[in-house]
Amino acid sequence: MTTLLIATRNAHKVAEIQAILGTGFACRPLLAEFPAAPIAVEDADTFAGNALKKAESLSHWLAASLQAGGSRDGHLTIGATRTFVLADDSGLEVDALGGAPGVHSARFAAMESGRDGNSPDADNNAKLLRLLATVPREKRTARFRCALALVEFFPSGDGQKEPHLFDGACEGWIDFAPRGKGGFGYDPLFIPTGRDQSFAELGEDVKNGISHRAKALAGLREWFGRSGGK
């Protein structure tokens, strides 16, 4: 069993990653289990840059904290299983908006008021619809992108291997109103190419077979199968 410490507090994201990877992996929310962990400033201009920054900084912090005896939670069994820190940075690119919200997807609405932190999904969706109010169907093309950064975790902090990056994209378009109750983020507005339902309507099984995150995780799973994670 390989343990993946997911660099997020987002329970939806952890559950989605676990569902896509299936057996052989135990996914855990690193930031929820270690509340004192620092949140990396996502100031890179690419999804891959942000994912890499989060994975490396959290891996180093966790090793230092465990050595100091400051963050043991009684559940992380070092040595019994190989453990990796996995960071995901993903978002929506809308062509009519020049690729926005892009790396700012989670804090899209908050940026208008200068607030720090992420915005509620409903606020982000409302802003997106407002900006696209006069844009016709044929120009509402968009895609979800996902970048994953994987770093093997060593409690000693020594011998950290080179990180591995994986990416995926899902093409589609932005609907004129939210549809469906499932998913999270921009899922109620995103209609993937070849479908007539939003991600929020398709259900987890269908979404997890075609999404940007599913494609990135397929690369990760294939890498583990080919290399044994080495």
Predicted regions and their residues:
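Anionic-ligand binding patches
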Residues: 2-5, 11-230
